[in-house]
Amino acid sequence: MSIQMATSYDLEWINNQYDSIGFVRSDLKRDKVAIITYNNEYAGVGRLVQIDEDTLEMGGIYILPQYRGIQLAGELVSFLVETAKKLQVQHVYCLPIEELEYFYKKYGYTEVDTTKEIVHPIVLKNIIGV
């Protein structure tokens, strides 16, 4: 298993995966995309999206079906969390579906109370669908 940051060479494969599951396509000028490989094969993808200079959103985590159940998603999230720390941004948000809240809490994410904390307007829009 290995994880590396994507290059323009990888972008077609990345966006084919995102298209297949209805996710927004990646743009390497805006997104920091990581690819996880297993036995030298592409196994999954995830990204950090720049919201503004102080804010990233982690998301787009997708592991191909044949590679699920071997903790690759956790490895990918850990890699992205470490990447975000190296970038020294102030806020990193993740907007998981309810079933994945526990999974992300294992990696240090906490639930944001939008009535008590200031949240970037784009993130707030995604949270409450404004």
Label for each model-derived stretch:
Residues 1-28, 35-37:
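Short amphipathic alpha-helix that is part of the acyltransferase structural core
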Residues 9-13, 53, 98-102:
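Short alpha-helical
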Residues 35, 41-50, 54-62:
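Conserved beta-strand in the GNAT
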Residues 42-46, 57, 80, 118-120, ...:
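Membrane-topology and secretion signals of cell-surface/extracellular proteins
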Residues 84-97:
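Conserved GNAT acetyl-CoA-binding A-motif
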Residues 95, 105, 110-130:
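Conserved catalytic-core motifs of GNAT/GCN5-like acyltransferases
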